[in-house]
């Protein structure tokens, strides 16, 4: 994944959103309640957040400190659900800048969203000035990830072990009974091939 040499041994802060893949599923899988779209978003998001965070940390093999963050805000398990969007790709930039082309669908002006924005800005400032964002570093043993969420009035964060592995995601896909095997194969070919397979 990444070449191992001294030039790549720099501290990294890797952030992803819970439903990173929600906007990448083609419109022909709409409506949002369609089982094929739900399958593509669920597992595409799991593979996307894993490959952009923990897979990178694993590939570095301890050559540099790594911190992982996962933005749950807006996703299916969030205190604030953003229907049809979830915790979409780019939500980090919207939270940091206050600018969003999703303003009609995703109100990021609530006290909770603003507190989450402040928490993210502080973590980035701390990382840039001190070399640490203020939570436990990821290691192969801890698999630490800071999960960030908000309701309408407050920000919430919790440190836990990273929720997935590539193997656990693939096993969940195989066990998922929401689609037939033929439907799964079609969805995986049309929407996940080229990303993860």
Regions found by a protein language model. Name each.
Residues 61-64, 75, 100, 104-197:
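Alpha/beta-hydrolase-fold serine-hydrolase catalytic core, especially in secreted/extracellular enzymes
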Residues 1-111, 130:
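Substrate-gating cap/lid region and adjacent catalytic-acid/histidine neighborhood
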